[in-house]
């Protein structure tokens, strides 16, 4: 039997002592344990607490947590695994309002991404499933998930009022062949908080492509491409506003604190703050702002269609490797304005001779 509704049993036992509750109330209180995706699909609508016990998701299927009843709690218990197939995914999808997703002690979500890794990520080779779609997961919380070896792209976030706390994404086994393993991609979202994330990966630890009122704090990012705004431009939504990245470490990564916008595009990046961010072992740029991205690559020729204003870099400190560049700022004419630059110190690398249109107060 794939699931059990414990509250219905309790309600039956207590019938002689209390008046019977309406059926709708019983359904709302029901607690269900599922051991298969088929049982989850057919039974989730009647459950207010869902426990996923040692789920083995069949190849080519999504663990479907969409359309959950308002206020549902989902608990990952034991080890969650996924069958192998070349497809786009996602491996997990969740939506709903006032949802809590968490994990029991000792639990883990093991994607076994090595089966897909070929060094090409999403740019060719095997078709790789994305990990977790958090679209329309509103006024909700994701707490304490431990995730291992995603094939490509981690959490895709398009939600409002979503808090993600104390999540581990450990793709350290993909150092050689893992690629495009972004941890958190945020787009068209408002009031997103990511607190206490620990990430070992091979791409952006955080990438905010659009959205407002976004906080990333107390993070640890190792091995990837750093904490990024962008690239901004060329999408339906090209506005980033009020983003705070604070009290975080970026270790052994390609970049540290980064803002990048698309060549020839329009949009805006405003109210972004990098505060108390420490760097170590950065291999390309410690602090970087570039307005020259075309087809995903820098051109060296910045444009000014995306305004980058009211930006704060405060106490971004640490070291890069000797072959890296401490700070690189490449702005379009007049597009980078009203920056606050305070207490930043990036050392160990080269000084750039290619900076352009550096705003007043900043240094390059």
From Swiss-Prot:
Record-linked PROSITE patterns: POLYGALACTURONASE (PS00502)
InterPro entries, alphabetized: Glyco_hydro_28 (IPR000743), Glycosyl_hydrlase_28 (IPR050434), PbH1 (IPR006626), Pectin_lyas_fold (IPR012334), Pectin_lyase_fold/virulence (IPR011050)
Glycosylation sites: 138, 338
Reactions that this protein is recorded to catalyse: (1,4-alpha-D-galacturonosyl)n+m + H2O = (1,4-alpha-D-galacturonosyl)n + (1,4-alpha-D-galacturonosyl)m
Subcellular location per the Swiss-Prot or TrEMBL entry: Secreted
Source organism per UniProt: Neosartorya fischeri (strain ATCC 1020 / DSM 3700 / CBS 544.65 / FGSC A1164 / JCM 1740 / NRRL 181 / WB 181) (Aspergillus fischerianus)
Enzyme class: hydrolase
Gene: pgaB
Signal peptide as annotated in the record: 1-20
Protein name: Probable endopolygalacturonase B
Stored Pfam families: Glyco_hydro_28
GO biological-process terms attached to the record: cell wall organization; pectin catabolic process
Function per UniProt: Involved in maceration and soft-rotting of plant tissue. Hydrolyzes the 1,4-alpha glycosidic bonds of de-esterified pectate in the smooth region of the plant cell wall.
Record keywords: Cell wall biogenesis/degradation, Disulfide bond, Glycoprotein, Glycosidase, Hydrolase, Repeat, Secreted, Signal, Zymogen
GO molecular function, one term: polygalacturonase activity
Catalytic residues, chain numbering: 203, 225
